[in-house]
Design a protein with these regions (language model features):
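Conserved phosphate- and dinucleotide-binding cores of soluble alpha/beta proteins
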Residues: 1-132
Length: 132
């Protein structure tokens, strides 16, 4: 699962950590066998160049997320910047999550590996439920 389109993935993980259950609700367009979407990575502003270099070494292509309604980059509620990182098909999301977490200056990334207790996908035929 990749989250962070709204740049709140760090906060979402804090909420998950304090909740008894983490349930994801999505539409069918979000379902995929292999993750191949950009991974948001929240970084400390001063660490951005180093984090970008390390992401590149991991095979990613980091891009600083620009704000849509103001000049400059997106700044999260906690003051982090967001790098949108393209990795292509992510065959081992757990390994990539661990590698990203190990980079100094990374506040949090949008890979939610083995965190959801249940996933509800709404379809035209009803709801598909996957429990962990």
């Amino acid at each position: 699962l990749v989250k962070g389109g709204g740049a709140a993935h760090a906060r979402e993980k804090y909420v998950d950590a304090s909740a008894d259950r983490f349930v994801v609700v999505a539409d069918p367009s979000k379902a995929a066998e292999v993750l191949d979407v950009s991974v948001p990575v929240a970084v400390l502003p001063d660490a951005r160049p180093v984090v970008a270099e390390r992401v590149t070494e991991l095979g990613g292509e980091p891009t600083l997320r620009d704000a849509e309604r103001k000049d400059g980059p997106v700044v999260t509620d906690d003051g982090s910047l967001v790098l949108d990182c393209e990795f292509g098909a992510i065959e081992a999301p757990g390994d990539l999550a661990a590698d990203l977490s190990a980079i100094p200056g990374v506040v949090e990334h949008g890979l939610f590996v083995d965190l959801a207790d249940a996933v509800y996908v709404g379809t035209s035929d009803g709801v598909q439920v996957t429990e962990r």
